[in-house]
Amino acid sequence: MATRRGDTLIFPKPPVIAAHACIGGKKEGESPLAAEFDELHSDNRLGQASWEAAETQLQLQTARLCLKKAHATEKDVSLLLAGDLQAQCTASGYAARALGLPFAGLFGACSTMAEALGVGACLCSAGMADGLLAMTCLLYTSDAADDM
């Protein structure tokens, strides 16, 4: 069980981040951080009919790239911790279904990734999960912003 030192949790068996992946869209490609992305798409819709479907595809591509970089498969994942800025975690739910993974939706807005890493660390340290996939998604686009 973790112990506390002030506001910090100390895990007897510290969790490990086995891999990470980051895929962005057009705006990310124009940013000063563009070189930090694994892949960039020039089409924010990723060929999809809606931006919800595009975010689902972005999450799927990123999850699969992360698993590949970790030399893992979906079978190595006990739980997917994910969220997005859509009502009811729409893109995350569809991505989880396509990956065939148990899913816990997180609603932290901009803090979703930090929330997923913190909750995931606690679950792994407590022996409740062996392999976790943590992800979040926000494409800088919507029907109103497609021409930006």
Where are these regions (language model features)?
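Active-site-proximal alpha-helical scaffold in enzymes
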Residues: 107-134
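A short, terminal or domain-edge coil/loop segment
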Residues: 27, 36-40, 128-139
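Acidic, glycine-rich active-site loops and adjacent beta-strand->loop/helix elements
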Residues: 83-88, 110-111, 136-139
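Residues within alpha-helical segments
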Residues: 60-67, 117, 121, 146
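Conserved "HGTGT" condensation-loop signature of ketosynthase/thiolase-family condensing enzymes
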Residues: 1-81, 85-104
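Glycine-/small-residue-rich "gating" segment that lines the acyl/pantetheine channel
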Residues: 2, 6, 114-118, 142
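Single conserved hydrophobic/aromatic residue that forms the stacking wall/gate
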Residues: 140-148
